[in-house]
Design a protein with these regions (language model features):
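Internal alpha-helical scaffold of NAD(P)-dependent oxidoreductase catalytic cores
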Residues: 1, 33, 37-43, 61-147
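Rossmann-like NAD(P)(H) cofactor-binding subdomain of soluble oxidoreductases
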Residues: 1-59, 77
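Short, solvent-exposed amphipathic alpha-helical segments in soluble enzyme
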Residues: 5-9, 82-83, 229
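Short beta-strand segments
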Residues: 17-18, 45-48, 67, 110, ...
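Conserved residues at beta->alpha junctions
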Residues: 21, 68, 215
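Short, small-residue-enriched loops and turns at beta-alpha junctions
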Residues: 22-24, 96-98, 159, 183
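NAD(P)-dependent Rossmann-like dehydrogenase/reductase catalytic/cofactor-binding core
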Residues: 104, 111-112, 117, 139-239
């Protein structure tokens, strides 16, 4: 979309990306792509975190994050957008916040898989171990691994892993049950990008790999789950 618009005509503007994802084929972050297409006088910021439009419309509040490489712009956006409906926090890690926000959609699909095979009780383990592997990736990419435990990833799980509004969770469950699903599930494309990053940075992403195998390699979901449970024993917080 940015490539099609006359973005170079913009000068001295702030572009806020209210989306979560990574570029297929490269794993590149959206802010980096936007920055490469915009004139250097512009500033890119990201608006990330949990929340569904349906709930905001009903007056249900939530917390979110705004991040940018420009601290002054970031502070201005947080101060101007904060309200009784959304409490914003200042982000401090573009890599971790963007990668974490994108990866949570893949975890959402995995949650749908668990619902589809009637093993929803494993969602606690999925949340814990999924966060751990995303933290490893963020660290390898030069970000702060603690970002995986913040609002942009772990903090967004309720809206993705459990919510009836989650397109990714619904897609995962429908996929397992061989039912048609016609809404956008961003995690379907994001998992491809994560496989690129996994290879590039040499990081283990067993849950993301299992999701990829089921979606793209027609792997058996129960067999993939069994393989995850049979992985070598280790301490919970080993790298």
């Amino acid at each position: 979309l940015l490539a099609e618009a006359p973005m170079q005509a913009l000068r001295n503007k702030t572009v806020v990306l209210c989306m979560k994802g990574l570029e297929m084929g490269t794993g590149e972050r959206l802010s980096v792509i936007a920055g490469s297409l915009l004139h250097e006088s512009n500033t890119v910021a990201v608006w990330l975190g949990p929340g569904h439009v349906q709930e905001f419309y009903r007056g249900i509040p939530n917390c979110m994050v705004i991040d940018s490489g420009n601290d002054a712009v970031k502070r201005r956006l947080v101060q101007e957008f904060s309200s009784d409906l959304i409490r914003f926090y200042y982000g401090g890690d573009m890599i971790g916040n963007e990668v974490g926000a994108a990866a949570k959609n893949v975890v959402g699909i995995a949650a749908g898989f668990l619902d589809g095979v009637e093993m929803s009780s494993l969602k606690g383990a999925l949340m814990s171990r999924g966060t751990r592997e995303v933290a490893r990736l963020i660290k390898a990419m030069g970000g702060n691994e603690l970002s995986a435990y913040g609002l942009c990833h772990l903090g967004d799980y309720e809206a993705t892993v459990f919510s009836p509004y989650s397109h990714n969770r619904q897609f995962g469950e429908s996929f397992i049950r061989h039912q048609d699903y016609h809404r956008l599930a961003e995690g379907y494309y994001t998992v491809e990008a994560l496989m690129v990053l996994r290879e590039k940075y040499g990081v283990e992403l067993p849950i993301c790999m299992a999701v990829h195998n089921i979606l793209y390699e027609s792997a058996d979901p129960r067999a993939e789950l069994s393989a995850l449970l049979r992985r070598g024993l280790r301490a919970e917080f080993d790298d």
